[in-house]
């Protein structure tokens, strides 16, 4: 395999996982903060807020997992070589 293609694949994999982790990480922090704030305002709605938060966090985390899958494909099942 061409060393330039291999280097580009490694760089693309690093960018894929890095960028895929930044957005959901910020979003999860904001969502958790808002959930804590909502529970502090309305303690009786804690169960509903917690359930919605966990579902939301799972959807956000799936974006990071998709980035990881793309990075692994670029590293080990290189489509360019």
Curated annotation (Swiss-Prot):
<dbReference type="GO" id="GO:0046933">
    <property type="term" value="F:proton-transporting ATP synthase activity, rotational mechanism"/>
</dbReference>
<dbReference type="InterPro" id="IPR038662">
    <property type="entry name" value="ATP_synth_F0_csu_sf"/>
</dbReference>
<keyword id="KW-0793">Thylakoid</keyword>
<keyword id="KW-0375">Hydrogen ion transport</keyword>
<keyword id="KW-0446">Lipid-binding</keyword>
<feature type="transmembrane region" description="Helical">
    <location>
        <begin position="57"/>
        <end position="77"/>
    </location>
</feature>
<comment type="similarity">
    <text>Belongs to the ATPase C chain family.</text>
</comment>
<dbReference type="InterPro" id="IPR002379">
    <property type="entry name" value="ATPase_proteolipid_c-like_dom"/>
</dbReference>
<dbReference type="GO" id="GO:0008289">
    <property type="term" value="F:lipid binding"/>
</dbReference>
<keyword id="KW-0813">Transport</keyword>
<dbReference type="InterPro" id="IPR000454">
    <property type="entry name" value="ATP_synth_F0_csu"/>
</dbReference>
<protein>
    <recommendedName>
        <fullName>ATP synthase subunit c</fullName>
    </recommendedName>
</protein>
<keyword id="KW-0406">Ion transport</keyword>
<keyword id="KW-1133">Transmembrane helix</keyword>
<dbReference type="InterPro" id="IPR005953">
    <property type="entry name" value="ATP_synth_csu_bac/chlpt"/>
</dbReference>
<keyword id="KW-0812">Transmembrane</keyword>
<dbReference type="Pfam" id="PF00137">
    <property type="entry name" value="ATP-synt_C"/>
</dbReference>
<keyword id="KW-0472">Membrane</keyword>
<comment type="subunit">
    <text>F-type ATPases have 2 components, F(1) - the catalytic core - and F(0) - the membrane proton channel. F(1) has five subunits: alpha(3), beta(3), gamma(1), delta(1), epsilon(1). F(0) has four main subunits: a(1), b(1), b'(1) and c(10-14). The alpha and beta chains form an alternating ring which encloses part of the gamma chain. F(1) is attached to F(0) by a central stalk formed by the gamma and epsilon chains, while a peripheral stalk is formed by the delta, b and b' chains.</text>
</comment>
<dbReference type="GO" id="GO:0033177">
    <property type="term" value="C:proton-transporting two-sector ATPase complex, proton-transporting domain"/>
</dbReference>
<keyword id="KW-0066">ATP synthesis</keyword>
<feature type="site" description="Reversibly protonated during proton transport">
    <location>
        <position position="61"/>
    </location>
</feature>
<dbReference type="InterPro" id="IPR020537">
    <property type="entry name" value="ATP_synth_F0_csu_DDCD_BS"/>
</dbReference>
<dbReference type="InterPro" id="IPR035921">
    <property type="entry name" value="F/V-ATP_Csub_sf"/>
</dbReference>
<feature type="transmembrane region" description="Helical">
    <location>
        <begin position="7"/>
        <end position="27"/>
    </location>
</feature>
<dbReference type="GO" id="GO:0031676">
    <property type="term" value="C:plasma membrane-derived thylakoid membrane"/>
</dbReference>
<dbReference type="GO" id="GO:0045259">
    <property type="term" value="C:proton-transporting ATP synthase complex"/>
</dbReference>
<keyword id="KW-0138">CF(0)</keyword>
<comment type="function">
    <text>Key component of the F(0) channel; it plays a direct role in translocation across the membrane. A homomeric c-ring of between 10-14 subunits forms the central stalk rotor element with the F(1) delta and epsilon subunits.</text>
</comment>
<comment type="function">
    <text>F(1)F(0) ATP synthase produces ATP from ADP in the presence of a proton or sodium gradient. F-type ATPases consist of two structural domains, F(1) containing the extramembraneous catalytic core and F(0) containing the membrane proton channel, linked together by a central stalk and a peripheral stalk. During catalysis, ATP synthesis in the catalytic domain of F(1) is coupled via a rotary mechanism of the central stalk subunits to proton translocation.</text>
</comment>
